[in-house]
């Protein structure tokens, strides 16, 4: 339906430019973790999507009911769902609450301290530790990993991940998490509904007078001491214009993620992450799930 970058006639969109730069590809994630559909905007397509995501993920949609399926100008629909639910190799300790990035509020944390069991160490792979302000670890699941990169950089996620990869390749220190090392990570919840209204109502270049009627995205993310759950949906309705409106023992390292950091989710056998997040203000990510 739409091939290549989305550009508008007589309208410059910074949001569209940023989205066009994103390089997410299906090859970054296994087929059993996503579902996509597109076609003419009919109730039959809606039923097809609802049945498919229920059978594949046992999930319902948060966006399909926001599409006008009876509007005759609603020509096409593009839809995608990403679903991930995985546990770490071992359950982490629940740590005392403390501040994040000099906040007034205290937040819940999990990780590894001096009382933790040695078997928990294998759930953490050290990517690099250059100094107390520049380090990264990967929490291990069976097929996925959570990469945490301590940095204040405001670069794009693509450039952040490139920096992280270079530092990981150059690191010659101990990649094992060992006795004396400590780990501290905040519990995180994100539930976000985004309506990209700035993309709507403008004629799309190189089409037969089509425009975006709705562009919706939802994210439901939870990370705790046992694992990660992620559900994300995206839907875009395309309308016609007719009715347009190991080493010797070393000093212990503190991998404390209690200040600004970047988070990536990646399948172990893939080279690029399928999800990224920058955590700076914990009030936006305050954990709302249960703690066991």
Model-derived features with residue positions:
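Hydrophobic-core positions in well-structured secondary-structure elements of globular domains
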Residues: 1-292
